[in-house]
Each structure stands twice: as structure tokens, then as C-alpha cells.
């Protein structure tokens, strides 16, 4: 069993914002796998099979900073192990068009990830970071305004392709594990002209 959890804020006000790219990737997974969401405890939940693996796609409906509050529910219902949970979220330290898989790590200042670490009791869970680019201002207010802003028209074409790449990466995690997925996807980057492969 694998859990693919996209982070974001619920409601129309936040649709299409940089902070909600995790939700967008979760929606892309649901579409790719031909399934639909149902309502779980404080989350939207979809079920699918990838080859012989049961997959649950999860979007917490708690608002970003409380994302981890659904972890006890997932654990009590399905006994989710940290290594089987891929958390998908936005990252200001990566440029738009770049994704990065990691097997573990700190929150990097991301409050949704911080909440998941708290409720899981460990930093040892895989994550898929989606680049949203750095803000012009690095102060806290500037960063908050930035993550709640929408992508420019030029960025939208890139982020659409990036979402598809992230869906591919998440499914590679399900099929092949985190290390193989990292090898296949961490060196790839989407540009505004074409999809390119670059080596680090």
C-alpha cells in the first residue's frame, strides 16, 4: 500500500495558487489513474491500483498548516508506514519547472510538512517537492503573499508540464521505490520552450 498526499489549502480562493501545486499534482494523479475522490475524515481521498499496489491519493482539507492532523486517521484506518507515504508540496527554493524527490529531511520551513513531521513523529518519509520559484522579497510577509499568489501566464505553461512530470515521478515511486524514482527524475527540468533533461 502506498499513500500519495498532496498539500494545499481547500476552497476556490486558493485554487491555482503556488502553495496549492501539491493539490494540483494529486488531482493529476486522480485523473491519470481514472479514479475519483470521496470524502474521508478531514480529507479528500481517492483509491486506485497501480499494477499490484493499492494506492490512496489524499488531499488534507484542514488548511496547509494543519496538514498532519489527518495522519492519526490514516494510521488507525490503514496503518500507514512513514516510508510508504509520499508527501507532495511546493518549494520556493526550486525554480518553476524543477521537481525533487528525497527520502527524508527537515520541513525546510514549510508549515504543512512541519505538521506532518510532528504527527508522524519522524522526518523519515519520502517527499516530492515542486518548484514554485523564489519570491522577490525574502521577509515573512513577502513569502506568504508569494505562495498565495498565482503563476504568471508564462509560468502556467511550464507548471502544467511540471505537474505531469510530478505525476510520473509519484507513480515511479509507487512502482520502483524512492531511490529509483530519484535517479529517474531529480535531474529533469521543464523549461518554457520544451521538456529537457539536464544532468546535475
Which residue stretches match the model-derived regions?
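Conserved TIR/SEFIR loop-to-helix hotspot centered on a Trp-containing motif
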Residues: 107
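A hydrophobic, small-residue-rich beta->alpha segment in the mid-to-C-terminal subdomain
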Residues: 153-154
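Nucleotide and nucleotide-moiety/phosphate-recognizing core
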Residues: 2-104, 113-129, 136-144, 157-200
Amino acid at each position: 500500500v502506498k499513500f500519495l498526499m498532496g498539500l494545499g489549502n481547500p476552497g476556490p480562493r486558493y485554487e491555482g495558487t503556488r502553495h496549492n501545486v501539491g493539490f494540483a499534482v494529486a488531482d493529476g494523479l486522480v485523473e491519470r489513474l481514472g479514479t475519483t475522490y470521496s470524502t474521508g475524515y478531514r480529507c479528500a481521498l481517492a483509491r486506485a491500483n497501480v499494477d499490484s499496489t493499492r494506492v490512496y491519493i489524499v488531499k488534507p482539507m484542514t488548511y496547509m498548516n494543519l496538514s498532519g492532523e489527518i495522519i492519526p486517521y490514516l494510521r488507525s484506518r490503514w496503518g500507514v508506514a512513514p516510508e510508504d507515504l509520499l508527501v507532495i508540496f511546493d518549494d520556493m527554493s526550486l525554480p518553476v519547472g524543477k521537481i525533487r524527490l528525497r527520502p527524508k529531511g527537515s520541513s525546510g520551513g514549510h508549515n504543512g510538512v512541519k505538521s506532518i513531521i510532528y504527527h508522524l513523529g519522524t522526518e523519515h518519509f519520502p517527499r516530492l517537492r515542486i518548484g514554485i520559484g523564489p519570491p522577490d522579497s525574502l521577509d515573512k510577509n513577502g513569502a506568504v503573499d508569494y505562495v498565495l499568489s498565482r503563476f504568471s501566464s508564462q509560468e502556467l505553461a511550464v507548471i502544467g508540464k511540471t505537474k505531469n512530470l510530478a505525476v510520473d515521478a509519484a507513480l515511479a515511486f509507487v512502482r520502483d521505490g524512492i531511490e529509483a524514482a530519484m535517479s529517474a527524475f531529480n535531474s529533469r527540468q521543464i523549461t518554457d520552450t520544451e521538456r529537457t533533461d539536464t544532468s546535475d
